[in-house]
Amino acid sequence: MKVTLYSDGSSRGNPGPGGYGTILRYVDPKGNVHEREFSGGEKETTNNRMELMGVIEGLRALKEKCAVELFSDSQYIVNALNNGWLRDWKRRGWKRRDGELKNAELWQELDGLLAKHAVTAHWVKGHADNEYNNRCDALATAERDKYTT
């Protein structure tokens, strides 16, 4: 099955309150479009952590092997997948060349999920004209704002 996954993460402060929003879309054999939204947040987190959580939650929801087109405005995630960073971190025992890999447990989980699917990652400009990225941003912002007073 072909699936499109859009995801965005947000934090106010880094660290600070944050949220993520994710949309999964697929077209069934009859041509019907199906969408599912996911969102969540944490009181004290970082933007990168929320970006990762959004992608992970979307992939966790897939119950069978899928061809996934991932769209994210996080260059960190897209570059990690497309430029071999994830592979290199794994090879080094989940460390960066210069030391600690932040959110290593999330990168490990993402790596396991990626092994179950054929994922192609694409960068999209945030806060621009991509309808689904903007919807994910709104979901992430709403979750983040639950933790701000």
Listing of model-derived features with the role each one plays in the protein:
Residues 1-49, 53, 57-66, 138-149:
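RNase H-like nuclease fold core
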Residues 10-17, 55-135, 139, 144:
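RNase H catalytic domain
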